[in-house]
Structure formats: C-alpha cells, structure tokens
Amino acid sequence: LTMMKSVSKEIINDCLSMDPIQTAELMTETNDFYYCPYIYGFSNYSRNNYRKNILKYIDVLDLSGKGPSGTHLGGTGIAVSNVSKNKDLAIEYAFWIAGAECQKSLFYQSGGQPGNSEAWEDEKINLETNDFFKATRKTLDLAWVRPRHNGYMEFQDKSGDVINEYLQTEISAESICEKLSDMYNKSFKE
C-alpha cells in the first residue's frame, strides 16, 4: 500500500477513477502516456488495427525477487448448469470451446482471449498480438487465481474504493489493512 501511495503521487488524478478498460482506451487512443505498471491484460489491445495505438504488454515488475508474481488471474469461464436439459451436449460444448484447437482458431479469430495454455504458446497468435501471451506468460504462471466464493466480487469492487480512499487521504496503511481484512472475512458470510 505504501508503494502504491508513493506511485499515486506521480500519476494524473483521472487514473484514480478509471477502470482498467478506460486506462487501456486512454493509452491506445492518445499519445500522452507511455507506461502503466499494473493493468489487466486485454490481448485485443495488442492486436494491430484494434485501436490507434498498440499496447505492448510485458511481465509485471519483480519486486519480490521471486519473479513477476503477486497479480491475480481472473476472467470469465464456462460452466454447465446442474438443471440443464441437455447436460451431455453442454458438457461436450464446454470441453470443445475450452480446448486448444478451438481456442487457437475460432475462439481467438472471433476476438476472444484464449485461456488455454497451448493457445498462449501459439506462434500465429503471438505474432498477431505482438507477443502478448509470451511476454506475460511468467506473470500468468505466477498469478494467484481470483477466489470464487459468492461474496468475493463485491469485496473486490468495494476494496478498490477503500484503497483509492487511502491513496487520496492521510488514512494510515495499517487502518486500511484492518478494514480490508474485515471486509474480506465478511465476504464469506454473504
């Protein structure tokens, strides 16, 4: 938190109210910004002709001596409802769309961001995304997977507001850590 606070003093105030997509849009539609140390990876912004400018993604900074770790891996997956009337067909579809061949072809070609590791290593995909997947692979491998319990997404949304408040005021890092810890523990009870 203290590192974030020192970095926050060097950025434009708009950054404190922007989400990751707004940040990517700003960086790809203007020539005013060169570097963003932490941003969600959206591979489409690395594709030629997606926006005015291309975002070149790389692994996050190694501040721990353990590699580019500490980020979280999220995203959208696919599941089959237990009450589906076509469970077998739905399961077959889920395996197909998550499989390497679909992820490397139709899924990617339709603008999707592959989650399959074989697609991450695909030469054509990396060529077309300016090495997005190769250049961030260590970060992906060392990321922790976002928790999946029911209250987590609300915690994530609200914790960002708490951290943002810390960055803009004189509240102590210790009190923010206590507040975040309480919020996280309560996220399991919802």
Residue ranges and their predicted role:
Residues M3-K85:
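Extracytoplasmic/periplasmic substrate-binding proteins
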Residues K66, G70, N86-A90, Y152-Q156, ...:
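Solvent-exposed, acidic/flexible segments
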